[in-house]
Amino acid sequence: MIKQRTLKQSIKVTGVGLHSGEKVTLTLRPAMPNTGVVYYRTDLNPAVAFPADPNSVRDTMLCTALINEQGVRISTVEHLNAALAGLGIDNIIIEVDAPEIPIMDGSASPFIYLLLDAGIEEQNAAKKFIRIKQYVRVEDGDKWAEFKPYNGFRLDFTIDFDHPAIGKDVRNYEMNFSAQAFVHQISRARTFGFMKDIEYLQSQGLVLGGSLDNAIVLDDYRILNEDGLRFKDELVRHKMLDAIGDLYMAGYNIIGDFKAYKSGHGLNNKLLRAVLANQEAWEFVTFEDKAQVPQGYVAPVQVLI
């Protein structure tokens, strides 16, 4: 049987909030089988829970934010969510003493190290996957995202920015998902932004924690980071990282073929909602026999960094 996974022990880290610029403490805790991914804001009394749910994503302007019925929000969940998807963690309690998850270095890599440091253990319950059964597509102007049936999790993402530093050869990335592929090819790709947008946002009291330490920053001509890029196509890889985090907002790893053009948090969420709203388009599956599992999900609990 392919089993659900949680952490072996709790672990804590501090970082900076991207929007507030304030110190944020993040605590990750093990959870019982079938708990799912649950975010908690512990700075509120009583603490407010945000179970990962695509219908709770009500703001995708600059990040993915979960907002409850009372208007309480928790922001910038997508990079941590991507790390959970990457390692196939089904059950976890995430506590944060602020309205946002710390930005760390702008990628999912620090969260991967944190999760592996806590240790991953299997639980005595079958892991559920969402298997795509029908073609589903959503569009927004010239942007689109789609799912097709496929026995694995394949991703194909294309960006299109009219910028001299983003050539045609670095606008597309394709990958067959596995924990190993995610850790090595995707998790280190950092978020990016354009100087003119950042200056405006900071004048509005946003992205106050944004810096060259936690983002790739571009002016009108070039990349401003002294050390350059981690991959020549780091920008499109980061967009794929975002998509993996956004699509894990259902709390289950997906078996299907995902393809997107210029998609962002909003369209990724719209696609996930469209799939789940159509009961003919998907099904829950579990695997009693490891031989039946799609190749990318036959992942060992130990991932080599």
Swiss-Prot record:
Residues forming the catalytic site: H265 (proton donor)
A GO CC term attached to the entry: membrane
InterPro entries per record: Ribosomal_Su5_D2-typ_SF, UDP-acyl_GlcNac_deAcase, UDP-acyl_GlcNac_deAcase_C, UDP-acyl_N-AcGlcN_deAcase_N
HAMAP family in the cross-refs: LpxC
Record family assignment: Belongs to the LpxC family.
Job description of the protein: Catalyzes the hydrolysis of UDP-3-O-myristoyl-N-acetylglucosamine to form UDP-3-O-myristoylglucosamine and acetate, the committed step in lipid A biosynthesis.
Protein name, entry field: UDP-3-O-acyl-N-acetylglucosamine deacetylase
Gene (name only): lpxC
